[in-house]
UniProtKB/Swiss-Prot annotation:
The lineage of its organism: Eukaryota, Metazoa, Chordata, Craniata, Vertebrata. Changing residue 108 to V: Decreased activation by histamine. Histamine binds at residues 107, 112, 198, 431. Changing residue 428 to A: Loss of activation by histamine. This is Histamine H1 receptor. Pfam families: 7tm_1 (PF00001). Residues 353-369 have a biased composition (Polar residues). The gene is HRH1. Changing residue 135 to A: No effect on activation by histamine.
Length: 487
């Protein structure tokens, strides 16, 4: 996955003493292990690509970068690893110069593309967290695809020095036909410069970006926690009836519900509110949660004013609540408590569209009673105020709920990126530390340690597809469906 990669093991003069006999018995257990890693790498990355292709929920902009990373890892597992194993079994390269150049090109290109894929994935997560609204308009599949193509184009620039080094630079050493090596294998300044550009600089930038992402997500979570303490949940936004035990209340401390329930008297001493036997009619003031295409997602209807009288006053029940019945689109009194199931069924995909708005369609509020039952007077301003108060709290909580879903998604994405970066750095930093040492100390090469660091870097291509289902529920479900694994 690096610029100066696995080929250094067999190409550099500093590791010139690395010789193995053909099919040595001591190498066979190692070959079996490395071949298993190779097969697992290919299988897992093919599984990732098939999962993204077959599952619509995975057709997101962010997963385009995952696809790019999987393609690079697939090349490592399908081309680079097998030829490295083959070269390990041979005492010299006997497959010809063209095949050698092909292997070196795939090694350098795939390694660089893997690094750049992680890098642009990190930038995407950073902008999604730091500039959510501005980046939302910019974050399209077309732009993401163009960015990925740009990363691969830069990676393919490695073909130029691999195939044409002698056309641009003077040859300083004699090429050895029995070894597969680049023409710049002994050019220390070039290898150090490319190592810095390909690994050290992107890694430092990714660490800086991820520190910013972690800080932003943490601040958002803390902010949301403070908001949640001051806002009721959906289950708490319900109209509580009067205490059936008749607990005494201090003057001036009556709740809006109690004020609403108190029967005002008209001039004749009669009750303004109608009797419990009267059938209430719903107040036509729908609240519409709408998306950009004006598709109606859900409706919550305000309760009718004449429900205020309630059976609670007539029957003495303390369990009468006003509940939203989503299936009929109207309010019903439910003796089991407030039904919030309809609100909780709004899926995250519905609530988290690229652009959402909350709009309220107000109409003239009219309440009628059945013929001969009398009419509700306009003296229920207190009740209407309580309706408005409840609606404002509900709408405020709904916005925070949507914001919470968005932050949960970003937090999961940040977690996934964190695991990918951790695996990337832990797998490749040993190789690059060792590489910088032997770049300046040609006699400091230990062939076994060098080989270990190279294959540790290759194992990063095996670990990446294991990280996705661990951090993404959609990947996990899709993998289980494809592999026919029952939960």
């Amino acid at each position: 996955m690096s610029l100066p990669n696995s080929s250094c093991l067999l190409e550099d003069k500093m590791c010139e003493g690395n010789k193995t006999t053909m099919a040595s018995p001591q190498l066979m257990p190692l070959v079996v292990v490395l071949s298993t890693i190779c097969l697992v790498t290919v299988g897992l990355n093919l599984l990732v690509l098939y999962a993204v292709r077959s599952e619509r929920k995975l057709h997101t902009v962010g997963n385009l970068y995952i696809v790019s990373l999987s393609v690079a890892d697939l090349i490592v597992g399908a081309v680079v690893m097998p030829m490295n194993i083959l070269y390990l079994l041979m005492s010299k390269w006997s497959l010809g110069r063209p095949l050698c150049l092909f292997w070196l090109s795939m090694d350098y290109v795939a390694s660089t593309a893997s690094i750049f894929s992680v890098f642009i994935l990190c930038i995407d997560r950073y902008r999604s967290v730091q500039q959510p609204l501005r980046y939302l308009k910019y974050r399209t599949k077309t732009r993401a695809s163009a960015t990925i193509l740009g990363a691969w184009f830069l990676s393919f620039l490695w073909v130029i020095p691999i195939l044409g080094w002698n056309h641009f630079m003077q040859q300083t050493s004699v090429r050895r036909e029995d070894k597969c090596e680049t023409d710049f294998y002994d050019v220390t300044w070039f290898k150090v410069m490319t190592a810095i550009i390909n690994f050290y600089l992107p890694t430092l930038l990714m660490l800086w970006f991820y520190a910013k992402i972690y800080k932003a997500v943490r601040q958002h979570c803390q902010h949301r926690e403070l908001i949640n303490r001051s806002l009721p949940s959906f289950s708490e936004i319900k109209l509580r009836p009067e205490n059936p035990k008749g607990d005494a209340k201090k003057p001036g401390k009556e709740s809006p519900w109690e004020v609403l329930k108190r029967k005002p008297k008209d001039a004749g001493g009669g009750s303004v509110l109608k009797s419990p036997s009267q059938t209430p009619k719903e107040m036509k003031s729908p609240v519409v949660f709408s998306q950009e295409d004006d598709r109606e997602v859900d409706k919550l209807y305000c309760f009718p004013l004449d429900i205020v009288h309630m059976q609670a006053a007539a029957e003495g029940s303390s369990r009468d609540y006003v509940a939203v019945n989503r299936s009929h689109g109207q309010l019903k009194t439910d003796e089991q408590g407030l039904n919030t199931h309809g609100a909780s069924e709004i899926s995250e995909d519905q609530m988290l569209g690229d652009s959402q708005s909350f709009s309220r369609t107000d109409s003239d509020t009219t309440t009628e009673t059945a013929p001969g039952k009398g009419k509700l007077r306009s003296g229920s301003n207190t009740g209407l105020d309580y309706i408005k108060f409840t609606w404002k709290r509900l709408r405020s909580h709904s916005r925070q709920y949507v914001s919470g879903l968005h932050m949960n998604r970003e937090r999961k994405a940040a977690k996934q990126l964190g695991f990918i970066m951790a695996a990337f750095i832990l797998c490749w930093i040993p190789y690059f530390i060792f590489f910088m040492v032997i770049a300046f100390c040609k006699n400091c090469c230990n062939e076994h340690l060098h080989m270990f660091t190279i294959w540790l870097g290759y194992i990063n291509s095996t670990l990446n597809p294991l990280i996705y289902p661990l951090c993404n529920e959609n990947f996990k479900k899709t993998f289980k469906r494809i592999l026919h694994i029952r939960s």
